[in-house]
C-alpha cells in the first residue's frame, strides 16, 4: 500500500489534531477537531482569532504536530508526527472548507470561528500494527519553477 494512502486512511478515522506554533521564542500547542483533505494533504480546523495559538500564528506560520489514537497496548500504537504551515483561510476558499467541515461536524455550525488550513509538508507515520516500531515517511514534493 502506498504510504500516503495508508496515512490518509488512518487519518480519516481520527478526529483530533494537536499542533504547535512558535513566536518570538515562545511555544504553544492547541488541539482541535479536524477535517482531513487527502487531495491537498491538509487539515482544516476552526479556531478563534483571539486564542493564544492564533495570535502567535498571525495570517500564516510554520507548525509541527501530532495525531494519535489511545490504544491500550504498545502493539496497537499508531500515529503521525508532522510539520507544515498553518494559514487562515479567507473568502471562497474559507466558505468551501467550512461547508466540508460542517458536513463532518454539524455541531460546529454554532461556532463562528475562522477556518484555518494546516498544510502538511512532512509526515512520519508510526504503525505498530505492522510490526513494532514500523515507520512510514512522506514528504511533499517541491514545486519546480519553469
UniProtKB/Swiss-Prot annotation:
<comment type="similarity">
    <text>Belongs to the UPF0306 family.</text>
</comment>
<dbReference type="InterPro" id="IPR012349">
    <property type="entry name" value="Split_barrel_FMN-bd"/>
</dbReference>
<dbReference type="InterPro" id="IPR011194">
    <property type="entry name" value="UPF0306"/>
</dbReference>
<protein>
    <recommendedName>
        <fullName>UPF0306 protein CKO_04548</fullName>
    </recommendedName>
</protein>
Amino acid at each position: 500500500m502506498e504510504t500516503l494512502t495508508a496515512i490518509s486512511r488512518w487519518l480519516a478515522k481520527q478526529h483530533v489534531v494537536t499542533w504547535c506554533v512558535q513566536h518570538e521564542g515562545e511555544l504553544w500547542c492547541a488541539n482541535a477537531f479536524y477535517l482531513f483533505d487527502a487531495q491537498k494533504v491538509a487539515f482544516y480546523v476552526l479556531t478563534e482569532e483571539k486564542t493564544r495559538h492564533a495570535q502567535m500564528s498571525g495570517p500564516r506560520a510554520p507548525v509541527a504536530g501530532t495525531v494519535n489514537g489511545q490504544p491500550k497496548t504498545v502493539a496497537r500504537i499508531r500515529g503521525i508526527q508532522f510539520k507544515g504551515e498553518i494559514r487562515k483561510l479567507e473568502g471562497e476558499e474559507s466558505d468551501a472548507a467550512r461547508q466540508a467541515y460542517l458536513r463532518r461536524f454539524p455541531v460546529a455550525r454554532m461556532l463562528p470561528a475562522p477556518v484555518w488550513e494546516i498544510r502538511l509538508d512532512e509526515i512520519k507515520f508510526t504503525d505498530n500494527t505492522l510490526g513494532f516500531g514500523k515507520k512510514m515517511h512522506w514528504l511533499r514534493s517541491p514545486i519546480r519553477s519553469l
